[in-house]
């Protein structure tokens, strides 16, 4: 599962922004209301940021058609300061900024909730308008409007699916921002990209991979004994608890590598069922197959199987033990009523991949060495000025601070050249 990654500490963010909020005029809320498509402006408790409703077409090819309100979060500093454009891939509930906020000193933070997530869901809901292009058009409308107020440098950034959002935006609107920093964002080239399974067969060392597989087989062999120990509510599993359990076992290695689990924590296959259950619960991959989990990520799964791409499971070693789920497919996680109608569009990511390799300027790609999603990291061929940093030993938490000093120097010198300003080294 492509996880939600949040950028920045909310406590530190509120303190920092409260201290500099006076740098903008008291009538900012009124100015925001004059921007095109801004429908509501609500100041958050404490007054450090604004929750903004921005009207968007559901289908940007029909701008006069159905509309919906997209939620934005603005933490302002000054009109001439840089703007960090946080491109969320999921829901959002506050301004972000992450490590870039510290590097840029006192930037404005503008975070955009992705369409079809959180409070930014059209009604009535038609899934066919949840496309990469429509989401990029959303970003373009927002940037165009807010540039009427904010004249400094603009930097788009996001992590995981949010990093994908930043990259897709770059491909369709290359001149809207001055730089793009994408964290741990895969660029898949198929509905079920085979490179991900190959990565899972080679990541780490053989001993660790063997231990993970033995653990999975033990979980399946003792399924009937372990499920009662999980204390799950069957009412939350419409697909059936046993089927969800087996999905969670198949998903386990992806969660293991994505979140940097230590192999020494894995029980031996002959451990007690209580020990096996405890470790399985710790990674919690079964949640994604519960009704709340499916609902939370259904929009992502729709995107995955129509445009963004995902992965399948190599079940060769597990097939004898899959009693409730003999033919697993993650399309089971797509929105109700869409599974049999989904058609994958290979042209979208083919365009994105080609554009990023041959045309995209001022882009930083950051990946973690052992992150499962590094399997489909962007491959650069030297045709643009883009740089890529793969952080040794890092997983889905990879960032510049964890990179080597040489990699940090490359990042800072490159960004300073692109932005024409000095960055604070954190």
Predicted regions and their residues:
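Bacterial Sec-dependent N-terminal signal peptides
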Residues: 1-26, 200-211, 426
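Catalytic-loop region of hydrolases
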Residues: 23-108, 413, 417-426
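Conserved alpha/beta-hydrolase
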Residues: 104-122
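Alpha/beta-hydrolase active-site loop
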Residues: 129-148
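Gly/Ala-rich beta-loop-alpha elbow adjacent to hydrolase catalytic centers
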Residues: 158-162, 166, 170
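Alpha/beta-hydrolase
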Residues: 168-302
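C-terminal subdomain of alpha/beta-hydrolase-fold enzymes, centered on the catalytic histidine
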Residues: 258-426
């Amino acid at each position: 599962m492509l996880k939600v990654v949040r950028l920045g500490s909310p406590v530190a963010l509120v303190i920092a922004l409260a201290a500099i909020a006076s740098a903008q005029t008291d009538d900012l809320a009124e100015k925001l209301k004059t921007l095109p498509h801004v429908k509501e402006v609500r100041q958050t408790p404490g007054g450090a940021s604004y929750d903004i409703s921005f009207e968007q077409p559901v289908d940007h090819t029909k701008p006069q058609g159905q509309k919906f309100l997209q939620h934005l979060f603005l933490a302002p500093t000054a009109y001439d300061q840089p703007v960090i454009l946080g491109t969320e891939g999921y829901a959002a509930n506050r301004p972000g900024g992450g490590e870039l906020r510290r590097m840029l000193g006192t930037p404005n933070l503008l975070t955009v909730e992705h369409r079809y997530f959180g409070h930014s869901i059209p009604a009535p809901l038609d899934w066919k308008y949840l496309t990469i292009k429509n989401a990029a058009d959303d970003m373009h409308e927002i940037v165009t409007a807010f540039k009427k107020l904010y004249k400094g440098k603009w930097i788009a950034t996001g992590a995981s699916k949010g990093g994908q959002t930043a990259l897709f935006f770059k491909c369709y609107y290359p001149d809207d921002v001055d730089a793009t920093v994408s964290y741990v964002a895969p660029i898949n080239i198929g509905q079920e990209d085979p490179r991900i399974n190959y990565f899972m067969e080679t990541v780490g060392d053989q001993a660790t991979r063997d231990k993970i597989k033995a653990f999975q087989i033990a979980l399946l062999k003792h399924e009937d004994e372990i499920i009662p120990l999980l204390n799950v509510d069957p009412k939350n599993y419409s697909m059936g608890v046993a089927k969800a359990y087996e999905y969670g076992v198949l998903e386990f290695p992806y969660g293991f590598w994505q979140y940097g689990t230590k192999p020494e924590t894995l029980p031996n296959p002959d451990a007690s069922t209580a020990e096996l259950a405890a470790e399985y619960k710790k990674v919690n991959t079964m949640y994604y197959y519960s009704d709340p989990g499916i609902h939370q990520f259904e929009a992502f799964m729709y995107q995955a199987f129509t445009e963004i791409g995902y992965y399948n499971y190599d079940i060769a070693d597990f097939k004898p033990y899959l009693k409730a789920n003999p033919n697993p497919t993650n399309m089971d996680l797509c929105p109700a009523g869409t599974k049999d109608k989904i058609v994958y569009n290979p042209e979208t990511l083919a365009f994105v991949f080609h554009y990023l390799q041959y045309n995209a300027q001022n882009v930083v790609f950051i990946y973690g060495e052992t992150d499962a999603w590094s399997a489909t990291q962007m491959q650069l061929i030297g045709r643009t000025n883009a740089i890529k940093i793969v952080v040794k030993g890092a997983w889905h938490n990879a960032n510049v601070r964890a990179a080597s000093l040489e990699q940090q120097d490359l990042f800072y010198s490159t960004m300073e050249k692109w932005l024409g300003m000095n960055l604070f080294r954190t």
